[in-house]
Amino acid sequence: MVAAGLVAGAAAAAAWFGAVPASLDDPAPAGPDLATPVAQLPDDTATDVCGSTIDVTRPRTERTFDAFYTTRREVLGITIVAGPDVESAAVDVAEVTLRRVFAGNDLEDRLAEAGAYIIVAEPDQGVLDLPEFGCLEDELGTRFFTHVCGIADRAENPVATVNALDLLGDRSGPCNGVNILYHEVGHLVHGWAVDPPDYFESRLLYSDALKAGLYDRQYASTNFREYFAEGTQAYFDAQDREGERNRTWLEHYDPALYELLRAIYGD
């Protein structure tokens, strides 16, 4: 997610990466309606999202992580990694988040097969400081990333990152203490794990929601990917710091999206 006023290239990047702005209340320009991402196996030897390639004929091998990540914890087949300055409590929250999202479904199996993993960034780390994403500075510049507090869904590389402070509920975190991992996992689920009919249904519901005047100047209006991810955030937690835009709110505000998410994730 990005703040309003960014250049078109940055808006497009936000749509592609599933980035989250430092302020959840900031509106964002609509991003492009990109082609459906195909859930394919990533290159397990790639160390950054710019150099990754896909070879679906190659037998799957164990993913190799950068040596910086001294913490590695597997949860439901999905690996959580973190650097040395990340408190174990933050990794615990990431684990609880994953277990909650996948408690009523088996979507984690598809993500695990794709090699998806979660990065918990250190408190003072920005996106470009992480081994996987540093290469994006040349591609997108630094300005875009000053507005980003979480990122996911590089099409060739199912990886998401959030800051440890936000997982711990610390208001000094990039997302002001909101556990934005629900949003970022929503991107991974949407791009890699949902069935095609549900994927296309989300596009139709997004269009219907905009026609009905929903999500005016809210980040969910950016594109159908952010619509799904923001819905996921509300379904499991809340979109806002006050906790008001939660599952109950979603059920009444956008019942069609609520029912789709309930069918995908379970109760």
Segments from the language model and where they lie:
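Hydrophobic membrane-insertion alpha-helices, especially the h-region
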Residues: V2-A15
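Ser/Thr-rich, Pro/Gly/Ala-heavy low-complexity intrinsically disordered linkers and tails
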Residues: W16-A39
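Metalloprotease/metallohydrolase-associated module, dominated by Zn2+-dependent proteases
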Residues: G18, L140-T161, R171, C175, ...
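Surface-exposed helix-capping loop/turn segments at secondary-structure junctions
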Residues: L24, N105-E108, D195-P196, R241-E242, ...
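A cross-kingdom marker for long, charged
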Residues: G31-V38, T45-R63, A238-D267
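Processing junctions and N-termini across compartments
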Residues: D43-D44, N223
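Acidic/His-rich structured neighborhood in mature extracellular/periplasmic domains
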Residues: G51, F65-T70, V75-I78, E87-R203
